[in-house]
Regions:
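Bacterial N-terminal signal peptides
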Residues: 6-20
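Positively charged n-region of N-terminal signal peptides that target proteins for export
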Residues: 1-4
Length: 355
């Protein structure tokens, strides 16, 4: 009887808690050292403030053009926005620092193929057609939502027509509403309609106690990224709060996804939650997070928020990161990482196995 009882108990446990039925595993990646191909003659990039992909797996990177004087003696500063085909060949480019937002930061491609960019040294976001034509701008270049109207002024977090060093944006494919991570100077998500009219906002500066407690709808410091899931939820990087906060479109808080650091100390000066992207399957079973604090890409089970695997380490070799800053995922599940500071490159990580 005893063996039969044990077998029945095991069967009951397996029925109630089937560990393998819904277990999520992480895919494996390898660096694609052949991507991108050589840039046009004499081109050189500065810090790459963002990377984004199109439905056709073309890749855009945004270039801050901040090369050194020595580099200017031998090279040409590449344009601000560079477009690659899936094989890594340059197929288009436009922009310079006089037209794009200052310290260009983040990019997003909407359903019509338009390219959106922000800038963490400016007060605007911009929308470009694929041929480089400027279609829309929200905010005024050099006019900040701060106490004195300058970049260094304390953020007011209130303006309906101004921003303060926005970090990124996402466009709702259903109605064209624009959600802005605002940003380095403010502590909010600002929402505009498809024509740029202000609709609503949420978020404010968090106290240290609120940051340590994971309080909803407040931000430790930089509101560093924003993304929308297929379910219509808004994912926001609370970078120094070491978490991704998830909201409904009206700002109602849904949950925290912690990205812990080794010390557990909060707020975290460097922060861990730098950028997010989703796996390309309809359910978006995986969430990818760029952790600039450890120079790693984390692969998370989307439903539970559990970190399944990570890749990357500090360094300059292929597959390493030097200020890994933003990431994007294409339709095949390949991951692209753009680096700022002295990294100044984009790397492709090819999916080679897994779910």
């Amino acid at each position: 009887m005893r063996p039969m009882l044990m077998a029945c108990a095991a069967l009951l446990a397996a029925t109630l808690h089937p560990p393998s039925l819904h277990a999520q595993t992480a895919p494996k990646f390898t660096i694609d050292a052949t991507w991108p191909k050589d840039l046009p003659k004499d081109w050189i990039t500065g810090q790459l403030g963002g990377v984004c992909t199109t439905a056709q797996d073309q890749v855009y990177v945004v270039n801050r053009r901040n090369i050194t004087d020595e580099e200017k003696e031998t090279s040409i500063s590449a344009p601000s926005i560079i477009r690659f085909d899936p094989d890594g060949n340059v197929i288009g480019s436009w922009g310079d620092e006089t037209t794009v937002p200052g310290s260009i930061h983040g990019c997003f491609v909407d359903q019509q193929g338009n390219v959106w960019v922000a800038g963490n040294a400016d007060a605007t976001i911009q929308k470009y057609a694929p041929d480089g034509k400027l279609l829309m701008q929200i905010g005024t270049r050099g006019k900040f939502d701060s106490v004195d109207g300058t970049r260094r002024g304390k953020g007011l977090n209130t303006a309906r027509d101004q921003l303060h060093m926005p970090a990124g944006m996402v466009v709702d494919p259903g109605n064209g509403d624009i959600y802005v991570a605002d940003g380095y100077g403010n502590r909010r998500v600002a929402v505009f309609d498809k024509d740029g009219k202000f609709l609503r906002q949420w978020g404010r500066q968090a106290s240290e106690e609120e940051t340590r407690g994971g309080a909803p709808g407040v931000f430790a410091e930089v509101v560093h990224c924003i993304a929308m899931s297929n379910a219509g939820l808004i994912y926001v990087c609370d970078r120094q709060g070491n978490r991704v906060q998830v909201f409904q479109k009206d700002g109602t808080f849904v949950r925290n996804i912690p990205i812990p650091n080794a010390s557990g100390k909060l707020p975290d000066k460097r922060g861990t939650a730098w950028w997010v992207a989703f796996s390309p399957d309809r359910e978006q079973k995986l969430l990818y997070v760029m952790n600039g604090g450890t120079e790693q890409v984390h692969i998370l089970d989307h439903a539970s928020g559990k970190i399944l695997s990570s890749f990357g380490r500090p360094g300059h070799q292929a597959g390493n990161f030097t200020h890994g800053h933003t990431l994007a995922v294409d339709s095949k599940g390949n991951v692209y990482v753009a680096e700022t500071d002295w990294g100044r490159r984009v790397q492709k990580f090819k999916i080679v196995g897994g779910p």
